[in-house]
Amino acid sequence: MLKSILCTFVPLSTANFKPIYCDLFEANYVINYLAMRGPKLQTFVIKSLIQLVCRITKFGWFDDDKFRDIVKEAADFLSLASQDHYFIGLKILYHLVGEMNQANAMPLTLHRKIACSFKDQFLLQIFQISLTSLHQLKSEVPDDFRRDPLSLALRCLSFDFVGCPVDESSEEFGTVQLPASWRPLLQDPSTVQIFFDYYKVNDTCVSKEALECLVRLASVRRSIFVEDPSRTQFLSHLMSGTKEILQTGQGLADHGNYHEFCRLLGRFKVNFQLSELLSIEFYGEWIGLVAEFTTKSLLSWQWASNSVYYLLSLWSRLVTSVPYLKSDTPSMLDETVPKITEGFITSRINSVQASFANDSSDDTLDNVDVLQEQLESLPYLCRFQYQNSSIYIINIMEPLLQAYTERSRLPAPGDANELSVIEGQLTWLVHIIAAILKIRQTIGCSQESQELIDAELAARVLQLINVTDTGVHAQRYRVLSKQRLGRAILIFVQNFRRSYVGDQAMHSSKQLYARLSELLGLNDHLVLLNAIVGKIATNLKCYAECEDVIDHTLSLFLELASGYMTGKLLLKLESTKFIIANHSVAVNLEATADAAFWTDVVKYAFIGLMRDLRGIAMATNSRRTYGLLFDWLYPSRMPLLLKAISLCADEPEVTTPLLKFMCEFVLNKAQRLTFDSSSPNGILLFREVSKLIVAYGSRILLLPNGTDIYGSKYKGIWISLAVLSRALCGNYVNFGVFELYGDRALADALDISLKMSLSVPLSDILAFKKLSKAFYGYIEVLFSSHITFVLNLDTNTFVHIVSTLESGLKGLDTGISTQCASAIDSLAAFYFNNITAADGPPSPAALNLARHIGEFPTLFPQILKTLFEIIIFEDAGNQWSLSRPILSLIMISEQVLVFLKLLNHVP
C-alpha cells in the first residue's frame, strides 16, 4: 500500500489530478503511518512521505477543507510524548511551508491563490509554533535537534508574502512584507531575543540560521509598526543584540556566521533612518563598535572580502543621510568614517603585495563584478570628508607615481616583480579615483571646492597616462599587471568624461579646468579629449594581444563617437584625423603581391578587415550611410576582394569572413539600397557579386572532399547561395538589362550557384540546418523570379530540383516547408498561366516545362498527395502557406479538377 502511494508522487508533481477521495485517503494513510511507524523509519523515507503529503495537500487545497487539517495534524504530533514524533511534526510544518512557497508545475495564478490562502490562515500559527518550540528546546535537547524549529522559523520569514519571489542565486532581498497580524509578535521583545540566544548557545550551523532569521526580522517593512515607540523598541533590541556580539566576538570566527552578521549590520540603514539610530541610548557605543569591526574586517580582506560589501554599504547610507539629519545629537561619523575610508584604501594597496607573494591567480582586479561591488560605496565615504580623503590618496599615489616615472627612464625594467607590484598598487588607486569621479555628490562642502579636489585627483591619473606609454613601459604591453593598469585607466577616462567633458560640463566646471590648466596645461575639454583619443589610438596599436583592453577601448571610442556633443568634438581633433587617415589596412593589402597573400600576416589582416567591414555594413541602416560605405568600396577596393577569394578559395578561414561580409553588404534592409533612378549602382553591385560567386564557385567545385566537408566546402557554399539570394530579391537590380546587353553576369552567377547546390547530396542538405535554409531560400528565389532559368535545364536536373522541394515539404522546419510550398506554387502557377490557360503560342520555357512533365507525368500528382497528407495527418504550424500550392496543383491536374466538380454536384 505504501509503495503504491509513493508512486503517485511523480504524477502529482506534473498536476495529474485524481479523485478527491483518493487524495484524502492517501494523505490520511501517510499521516497515520508516520504516527505509528515514523520514529523507526530512515530519515530519507520520512522526508519523502512528508513531501508527498504536502504535495497532495497543496493540490487539493481548494477541493475540500479537510486537506487543510494537516496543520492541526502536525500540531498533534507535537503533543505526543515521543520526542521523535515532536520533530516529525516540525518537519511536516517545515516542508508544508516550503511546498506552499514554490510554484511546482501548477499554473502561477493557482499557486498564488493557494499560497495567499495558506499565508492568511496558517503561516502565523506555524511561526508561533516555531517560536514556542525554540523556547521549549532551548536547553533540553542537543544542538542538532534545535535546528529544526529554527529552520521552520527561517522558512516562515522567507515566505513570499506578496508574490515577488526572491532570486535564489542572489543574497540581496528587499523588504519583508509581513502582514499586520504579525505585529504583536514583532513587538514582543522575546521574538528577537530568542534568536540572539540561539546564536550564543549553539554550534555554527544553528547559529548561522539564527542570524539569517535576524536578517529577515531587520528587513520587515517600516509600516508594520504603527507607532514610533514600538519601532524604536524593536530597533533597540536589534542594536543591543548586535552590540553584545561585537563586544564578545562570539561565533565570528566562523566564516558563515561572520558573513551573515555583516549582512545583519548592513540592513540597519536600509529599514531605519539615521535619526532613529541616534535616538537609541547606546548609539555612540554601538557605532564605535561597528567602526572597529569594519576596520578589522578591512584588514582581514582575504578572509572577509565577500562580506565587507555589506559593511561599506551601511556606512555609505549613513553618510548620505547626514544632510537630512535634524537632530542635534552627534552622529560620530566625522570621527569614524575617515578611518574606515583610509582602512579600505590601505587594505587594497596592501592586497597587491600579498597577492603577488602568494602567487594568487584569483585577483579582484580581474573580476569586474567583484571590483564594482567593492567600489560601489567608496565614493560616498570619500566625499563625506573629501579634503582629508583626497590628501590621503594623493600622499599614497605621489611616491608610487614618482617611482613609476623613474623606472620609465631606466634603460632596462630592472626588477620585474617590483614593477608589477607598483603597477598593481597604481591600478587600485586609479580604480578608486575613477569610482570617486563617477559620483558627483556634495556632502559637507561646496561644488567649487569639490571640483578643485576632483582636478587634483584627476591630474595624477592624467599624469600617469603620459608615463605608461614611455620608456621601458612601452615594452610591457603583454605583462598582466600593465594590462590591468590599462583597463583601470580606461574606466577612469570613461567616468571622467561623463562628468566633465562636453559643452555643458565645460561651462559648469570652470574651476576644474582652471586647476588642470595650472597642473598639466589642459585648459579646456577639447585639449583633454584630444589626449583621450590619443590614448585610444595607442591602446589600439599596442594592446593588440589583450582582448579585454581592446574591447574596453573600442567601447570608449564608440561612446565618444555616439555622443551628441563629443561626436562633433571628435571631428575637430588632430588625433581623430590621424586615426581616420591611418586606420585602413586595405591600401597595403591591395599592393600585396600574390605570393605574399599566402602568408599568415596578410591573411590575418584581411580576415580582420572583412570582419570590421561586416560590422560597419550591419550598422548602416540608411541610404546615406550605406552610400558612404559603397562609395568607399566601389570601384577602388572591390578588386581586393576578388583577388583574395581567387587566391584563397581553399582556405575557409579567409573566404568565410569575406562571404559573410558580402552577405551583409547586399542585404537591402530598411531600403538602404535604394539608388537614384539615374544611378547604375545596383547593376554594378550585382556584377561584383557575380564575379565573386563565379570565382569562388569555380574553384571550390574542383577541391576534393576532406574530412571536415562542412567546414571546407558546405559552409562556403551556403553563404554563397545566401549572398546570391539576397542580391536576387533585393529589388535594386533590373535583371533584364544583362540579357539585353549581352552581359553574362546573371547567367554565370545562376549557372555556378546551381552547380554548387547540385554538388551537395540531398541527405547532406537536409542534415545541415544552415545549408538547408540557404539552399531552399535560393531555390524559392529561382522559382519566383528566374523560373525560366530553371525550366531551361535538362529534364533530370529539373526533376531532381522539384524532388528536393517535396523532401523539404516533409521536413520539420516550418520555414523550409514554407519556402518549398512557395516555390511549388510559383511553378504550378506558371504551368497554369502558360500552358493550361494560355491563349497564344507557348514560350520556349513553357515548351520545356511541358516536355519535363510529359516525361514525368506523376510529378505534380505526387506533390499534391504529399501536401494533402501533411495537412490532414500532421499538425503543421504553416497550414495556410501549404494550402496555397494545393489550388494551383488542382487547377493544372485535369482529372482531379473534374472529380472535384462532379463531387460538388452530388446531392
Model region roles, listed by residue range:
Residues 12-20, 143-144, 327, 416-420, ...:
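Short, surface-exposed loop/turn segments at secondary-structure junctions
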Residues 12-20, 37-47, 57-68, 82-87, ...:
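Alpha-helix boundary/capping segments in eukaryotic regulatory proteins
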